[in-house]
Amino acid sequence: MAASTAVIAGEYTASLGPFEPESPVYVAVGEPTRAPIGWVNFCIEYRSECVTKASDPRDVVLTPKAWTDMLKVNAWVNQSIKPMTDLEHWGVVERWNYPDDGYGDCEDYVLLKRRMLMQAGWPREALLITVVRDKKGDGHAVLTVKTDRGEFILDNQEPEVLPWTKTGYRFVKRQSQSDPNVWVALGEPRTAPATVSAR
């Protein structure tokens, strides 16, 4: 049984979260911008995962089951992977990879969560790798899940899945919904970090 299937099949108790009445809010999407070098190099190593045709944007319909499944995947990855910098792990400043050996930094958590949700049938177009500045002002990567009830953030620094407006982060850029190799600026144009994170 695939890890994603096993995790989603497990028990999980969670609050209703977004199912309390609230108007969805979406981050402002700007012009195309440069993809992070970590993503570019990831696509050289995992070419088959990055060769894709442009597609129409798709949002997840966030049913109670979908919400619970998302929480399960987020919690399982956060609890299963031990944090380690790329320099400690690979001897380089920036490398995006799947944390198959149980260690990784923020981008690696994101890649695994994205893969597990896609394996469970979630649309790629709604699972967007996102670069932010965290509460300390450091570069950081999270997974944005775009739904009909707003955009939610899966984050290795935060155990809860939060709406993007409640993270306290400044959103810099992310994958476009139509093509994961096209990245778009978010909010007001600002200088993006050269690397994503050392954590």
Give residue spans per PLM region.
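A structural boundary/capping signal
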Residues: 8-199
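N-terminal signal peptide c-region/cleavage motif recognized by signal peptidases
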Residues: 4-6
